[in-house]
Amino acid sequence: MKNRGFNTHRHGDGSTVVPPAAEVHLRDTMGELPLLYAAADIAIVGGSLIEIKGIGGHNLLEPCAVATPVLFGRYISDFLEISHNIVERAAGIQVHDSNDLRDTLKKLLNDAALRNRMGANGIQVIKENRGATQRTLELCIPLIESDVLVREH
């Protein structure tokens, strides 16, 4: 990114001061993403762009929850259903290679109205998926109370 003329900052390499002119933030830490997603114009879920053994992607709902359009790659095996929902609802875009990522970023960076629509769509995705734990419990409780799930000793 520096080679392309962007002011960058990498957090997690020991530095604690964020340069005021930083345009691109690379984070390699835990617990900071929700705040950063809320401040961002676009979120790129980088862990989905490359195959990482034992990792099936990263949470695509976090950017949606703060109305930030999300871009992600193909390595999302743990989030297939929600990724399809995000794409269908136009809250995010799955990119297929570096050229696709570049072109999609250019398009979004130059179209604030599109980013705003995608952000609003992301909030809708979150609203539609609330209550998943309750729905899961409603499906599981009858099984637990029946003889279907009996531990054999």
Label each residue range with its predicted role.
Residues 1-153:
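Nucleotide-activated sugar donor-binding and catalytic core shared by glycosyltransferases
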